[in-house]
Amino acid sequence: MKNILKVFNTTILALIIIIATFSNSANAADSGTLNYEVYKYNTNDTSIANDYFNKPAKYIKKNGKLYVQITVNHSHWITGMSIEGHKENIISKNTAKDERTSEFEVSKLNGKIDGKIDVYIDEKVNGKPFKYDHHYNITYKFNGPTDVAGANAPGKDDKNSASGSDKGSDGTTTGQSESNSSNKDKVENPQTNAGTPAYIYTIPVASLALLIAITLFVRKKSKGNVE
């Protein structure tokens, strides 16, 4: 009887270790960091807004969908953001650093993705009064992994992009020249593969079946010893 209990306990411990190992491996494969740049819309030219985005970003896969978590500085200047039509989901703020981290659903982690940014400034900049109110399209260039697939599609982005080189109230140009072009949500090779790997569900089911079988075996042996 003692030997049977030892085998039973060892088996349970082994199952726990196996499940934990596979779960950790799956989670590790579906999250990480990615470098990126912010371009002027539909170009390869770096946007002036690029300086307001901290690098790298973080990506995570949840329920078969891909998300990126992006941190911006000068947070109070950036009044709104969206990527592929998906509005930001603010997950953290740091008032002291004037930063916030927002999460966006995306279709891929590598390549160009369209976005939109709203900027409002009404304060002194470099010692001079400055007022700037602008909404414009931008393009993100993600340099993340190509082997992490998502099942999501782009949302409906706002088609009304703002004009290019604007001026503040003091007549100083912002140095930003964004394209005045409608956003057609051109997504390169959208990923449509399923989400969570099948083995994540198979392992617990198989483990439960094995546990039941071992339990029944132990009970049967115990009855045999008593009789």
From Swiss-Prot:
Q: Provide the GO biological process annotations.
A: heme transport
- In this chain the NEAT domain maps to 29-150
Region called Disordered, residue ranges: 149-194
Q: Which residues bind heme?
A: S47, I48, Y132, Y136
Q: What is its main location?
A: secreted
Where is the sequence biased in composition, kind Low complexity? Answer: 161-175
State the conditions that upregulate or repress this gene.
Answer: Repressed by fur in the presence of iron.
Which positions carry the signal peptide feature in this UniProt record?
Answer: 1-28
Subunit field text: Monomer. Interacts with IsdA.
Similarity comment text for this entry: Belongs to the IsdC family.
- The entry's protein name is Iron-regulated surface determinant protein C
Q: Which organism is it from?
A: Staphylococcus aureus (strain COL)
